[in-house]
Amino acid sequence: MIDERLDKPAMLAASRHVNVIVDCTDNFETRFFLNEISRENQIPLVSGAAIRFDGQVTVYDPRQADSPCYRCLYEDKGELQETCSESGVFAPMLAMIGGTQAAETLKLLAKIGTPLTGRLLLLDGLSMSWREIKLKPDPSCPVCADSHHHE
């Protein structure tokens, strides 16, 4: 477990000693970088996010040929993206998304159950309903497209 602020070189060094990356960050620059580390080092990435009354969780697993990566879903739009520190977040959403991330992480580490790879869980906190979206790799993804074309 890493519980301190890390710059990019420190993140790269730390990634050599982990089995799963759990992304609980609040900015896209860090999320994109964690995604690159995940892909380069073949480490599963458990991604969770919450803003206002909405949350989402998925697993990107570069060890699986049909797994998309974070960049397959999200473009790099620079500083245009909202953060929960700017837009606010309904506090219970953090516990629900974080708990789901913890469950996915434990499943990966224990090699039990079916991880959320290729599926995005979306939580609507106002109606308290979950929905699931199937995810596929983007053939034009700048991070992982080459790995999908050669398999």
Give, region by region, the residue ranges found by the protein language model:
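Conserved SAM/SAH-binding loop
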Residues: 2-11
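Glycine-rich phosphate/adenylate-binding loop
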Residues: 10-151
